[in-house]
Design a protein with these regions (language model features):
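Conserved anion-binding
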Residues: 26-31, 46-153
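An active-site metal/cofactor-coordinating segment within enzyme catalytic domains
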Residues: 1-41, 50-53, 62, 71-74
């Protein structure tokens, strides 16, 4: 959480780096030790490499943030282009991480169908972050029934 996409703020890549050194890397996808970083941030593409370097295994971004952000691929990068969620998934994979896409409860799930060729994780938060900086636990609703019906699996 960066204080822009959502009003709350939380820790970033430096803290992930410190924690990663105390946790064994997973031996399988989604296995014990997987660092699933759910990025509730305004510029999700900017931070992919930093979180990869920090030890992130699964980089989950919000669809809504991606479509309204620039395509800059580093914190100091500049771009006038908008981020394509489908291209962001490919970029995350090219950096050696699994990709996840989250959508807000108010976003129609249909926006995901064109993106989900090879998803690693799909989730829909059933609550939004609290603007009062209260701790909000996010639970997820399994939306994979739709993609599995469309794409098999």
């Amino acid at each position: 959480m960066d204080g822009h996409f959502v009003p709350n703020m939380t820790f970033g890549a430096p803290v992930v780096t410190k924690i990663r050194s105390h946790v064994d890397r997973p031996t399988t996808a989604h296995g014990k030790g997987t660092f699933d970083c759910h990025m509730m941030i305004a510029e999700p593409k900017r931070w992919v490499r930093d979180f990869k370097k920090a030890g992130c295994d699964l980089y989950c971004f919000h669809y809504e943030a991606a479509v309204s952000s620039t395509a800059a691929d580093s914190p100091s990068g500049k771009s006038d282009q908008k981020t394509s969620p489908k291209e962001l998934v490919k970029f995350i994979h090219s950096e050696g991480m699994q990709a996840g896409i989250a959508i807000k409860p108010s976003t129609p799930v249909d926006v995901l169908w064109e993106i989900l060729e090879n998803p690693n994780k799909d989730e829909v938060p059933d609550v939004s972050s609290s603007p009062l900086h209260r701790h909000a636990f996010i639970t997820t609703i399994d939306i994979t029934k739709g993609p599995h019906a469309l794409y098999g699996g």
